[in-house]
Amino acid sequence: MKPVFLDFEQPIAELTNKIDELRFVQDESAVDISDEIHRLQKKSNDLTKSIFSKLTPAQISQVSRHPQRPYTLDYIEALFTDFEELHGDRHFADDYAIVGGLARFNGQSVMVVGHQKGRDTKEKIRRNFGMPRPEGYRKALRLMKTAEKFGLPVMTFIDTPGAYPGIGAEERGQSEAIGKNLYELTRLRVPVLCTVIGEGGSGGALAVALGDYVNMLQYSTYSVISPEGCASILWKTAEKAADAAQALGITADRLQKLDLVDTVIKEPLGGAHRDFGQTMKNVKAVLEKQLHEAQSIPLADLLSRRFDRIMAYGKFSEQ
């Protein structure tokens, strides 16, 4: 797959194109230019490190939405075995913006639930761009309650712009569905591990992100509203999105300082989409450790810790 570069990555894109051209020349001729290719590759890596070491919140927001980032189904394929997808909410329909089912993690049975976006236009429409309707959240809850019934740990992956705000979704009880999930997650009697892998958009993300451990990938975001939405409300123009991103504190490092996130999972150079394999290794290492810890804690203590975490939400600072 040809890499897609964001606006602020254009200097990297230019170097990458030069490297590709030189590789083509080397393949088509007897001239040895491997030293020049190596020099440009090192220059590209150094430039990438420099750019990504000082990303603004607005730029991190762009990375979190990168069209080539790994999605929930990519994590399921890489981290789990024997995945059996479960469908429907048993009330209205099957929402493809939420995927989930039974799987094995290191041989242990678990329930996996997550948002799913699409790669191409057809798939994006089918998945509703990763924005669940009420039936999606009710499906997620059905799966999590099934996990509770059989004593299976729950692992969730969060990547959504937010819950779908359409009229039909509101008529079918969007806010009730999200609220019900939040209520049930506070007392679900199994370990719950949550990982934000891309966008963590408002209540649409929170509805599957209340757990004993909450992780974020290094270049993911988590906020009550998108920077563009915030800018449109406060400044009446989306052009102020960069200012909104700064004020909202949407980045993993910022949220960890506020004790809203347990672990920030390091991403490969250039973002998770540049090296799926390394990303999966990093995520798996964290989930293995946390699952072991969660299962060693008495259930009553686990639930008490989870409740205390939720009650601590809403702190604010005037700084």
Swiss-Prot record:
GO biological process: fatty acid biosynthetic process; malonyl-CoA biosynthetic process
Pathway given in the UniProt record: Lipid metabolism; malonyl-CoA biosynthesis; malonyl-CoA from acetyl-CoA: step 1/1
Reactions catalysed: N(6)-carboxybiotinyl-L-lysyl-[protein] + acetyl-CoA = N(6)-biotinyl-L-lysyl-[protein] + malonyl-CoA
GO CC term (a single one): acetyl-CoA carboxylase complex
Entry's EC annotation: 2.1.3.15
Keyword annotations: ATP-binding, Cytoplasm, Fatty acid biosynthesis, Fatty acid metabolism, Lipid biosynthesis, Lipid metabolism, Nucleotide-binding, Transferase
Function (record text): Component of the acetyl coenzyme A carboxylase (ACC) complex. First, biotin carboxylase catalyzes the carboxylation of biotin on its carrier protein (BCCP) and then the CO(2) group is transferred by the carboxyltransferase to acetyl-CoA to form malonyl-CoA.
Family: Belongs to the AccA family.
Protein name: Acetyl-coenzyme A carboxylase carboxyl transferase subunit alpha
